[in-house]
Swiss-Prot record:
It is an enzyme of class 3 (hydrolase). One of its GO terms (molecular function) is acylphosphatase activity. Its EC number is 3.6.1.7. It comes from the Eukaryota. Residues 9-99 form the Acylphosphatase-like domain. The gene is Acyp1. The keyword Zinc does not apply. This is Acylphosphatase-1. It holds the Pfam family Acylphosphatase. It comes from Mus musculus. The modification N-acetylalanine is found at residue 2. It catalyses: an acyl phosphate + H2O = a carboxylate + phosphate + H(+).
Amino acid sequence: MAEGDTLVSVDYEIFGKVQGVFFRKYTQAEGKKLGLVGWVQNTDRGTVQGQLQGPVSKVRFMQQWLETRGSPKSHIDRANFNNEKVIANLDYSDFQIVK
């Protein structure tokens, strides 16, 4: 298996103006476009959090997207990524918005 094909899982939390600006919808759409699986949800702290799973090259692209792009009306202050690990199989079959 090539390096870019290694499956990884990583948790994320995005800080800034990320609620009420369709951030979850755009995150889900971008994740699906890249073929990633996982989830995204708003938190009570005014952040957005979730988990990404997929090939490391696609996860890296999505991490950069979460740090720098987001939804058109969002303003991202920072993105935290943690608990990254190599996985043998995906835990999810889709990219879901969790309410």
